[in-house]
Amino acid sequence: MATSRRVSRVSSLIKREVSQMLLHEIKDDRVGTGMVSVTEVEVSGDLQHAKIFVSIYGSPEAKASTMAGLHSAAPFVRRELGQRMRLRRTPEVSFLEDRSLERGDKILNLLNNLPQAIATEDLEDDDSGLALD
């Protein structure tokens, strides 16, 4: 079992190398339909599996097409990682879509609209209140 420092270093190295591959070496047209960025890489403790989280900007169709292209490019990415990194065994690579940015944007929109909703409720409560005379 690798130490957590080694796992962290391998993870950051994979992130850097895969980002470079996305920019320059993956020739699949489907990968280019949406703007893709690597947000995080999780490597298992035994360095045998790597989950690569990608954020894709574009329409839902472009996202689906890009993910299909990334899944088909996974063997190429693994082979390239094996040639570039000095590891005993190259980890199995899987691409997963990272939706945290979308969720964060949705939460920010809800929080920004919250003061307006509270102000509207306060006005409705003031209008429906009983007058004491």
UniProtKB/Swiss-Prot annotation:
Subunit field text: Monomer. Binds 30S ribosomal subunits, but not 50S ribosomal subunits or 70S ribosomes.
Origin species: Synechocystis sp. (strain ATCC 27184 / PCC 6803 / Kazusa)
Protein name: Ribosome-binding factor A
The keyword Kinase is assigned to this record: no
Example of a GO cellular component annotation carried by this entry: cytosol
Annotated GO biological process: maturation of SSU-rRNA; ribosome biogenesis
Keyword Cytoplasm: yes
Example GO molecular function: ribosomal small subunit binding
Protein function: One of several proteins that assist in the late maturation steps of the functional core of the 30S ribosomal subunit. Associates with free 30S ribosomal subunits (but not with 30S subunits that are part of 70S ribosomes or polysomes). Required for efficient processing of 16S rRNA. May interact with the 5'-terminal helix region of 16S rRNA.
A Pfam family the protein falls into: RBFA
Keywords: Cytoplasm, Ribosome biogenesis
Subcellular location, record wording: Cytoplasm
